[in-house]
Amino acid sequence: MGSHPYAYLHYGYNLGGGGTPWNISELPSDEDYPEWIPSWIDPFEAADIVREQCYYDLVEERLLAEVGGFRERRADHDKSGYYMRRHAALKRVGIELSGHGYMPDSEIGGYVLHIYETSVQPLDPAYAVDFASLEHRRVEEEWDGRLDQAMSALQITCTQPAGWLLVASYT
């Protein structure tokens, strides 16, 4: 594997993809190994858009617009306060897409759409997790509802329920 292993604890959806099959219901049914093409992008330009922007950027932009109410385009970055407004919107959304698995040449094992993340790294390999506190936060902060809102904005349904995911990455 890689020379820098990391373990991440997420609360969210395991979307699959990368080197594994997608765990998304909205996939083309006429392909042996279907790729997720987001329904909100032009299908004729989809392959180029996914290759140029990658799923991380596509998902972030969509969640910023649909969940965070931030519709300024990146081209507008010269406006005064753009990055402060963008950062505030990202914080409001509170959900992001992460990759996991072995990442040679940007190949990944899959994607997780998550609302919570903590990690264990080689310098601090033991990390105590207070699951009772996290479960309290999950309920109080309505993580499931917020994740469902994000999935609705992305116009996808995961074939697996949201939950706690322990994933490894190697860089």
Where are these regions (language model features)?
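Acidic (Asp/Glu-rich) sequence patches and key acidic residues
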Residues: 1-152, 156-157, 170-171
